């Protein structure tokens, strides 16, 4: 609903400031196309992320995403704490 109001508001602004009807049509068409492309990009990004997580052919791929450089300094402390128990 917000997108519809945004498009109508932009159309009103276009009607107010445009020089001719053709310019208004072109501006509205461009705005609608831009919003549609943005929505499609967001949806495709979400679908791509879902596909990677659920249909992962390589089971170790998720472990490659871990930032080992951030974790490695803590490993000795974890081993030391686990060894004291």
UniProtKB/Swiss-Prot annotation:
Q: Does the keyword Lipid metabolism apply?
A: no
Alanine amide found at: 82
Sorted alphabetically, the Gene Ontology cellular component annotations on this record are: extracellular region
- UniProt subcellular location: Secreted; Target cell membrane
Tissue expression, as annotated, is:
Expressed in entodermal epithelium along the body column.
Keywords attached to this entry: Amidation, Antibiotic, Antimicrobial, Immunity, Innate immunity, Membrane, Secreted, Signal, Target cell membrane, Target membrane
Give the top-rank taxon of the lineage listed in the UniProt record for this protein. Eukaryota
- Give the signal peptide, or none: 1-18
Propeptide, residue positions: 19-57
- What does the UniProt record say this protein does? Antimicrobial peptide with a broad-spectrum antimicrobial activity. Keeps its antibacterial activity under a wide range of salt concentrations that mimic physiological conditions of human blood, which is surprising, since Hydra is an obligate freshwater animal with nearly no salt tolerance. Does not affect red blood cells.
Family indicated by similarity? Belongs to the arminin family.
Quote the protein name from its UniProt record.
Answer: Arminin 524
What organism is the protein native to?
Hydra oligactis
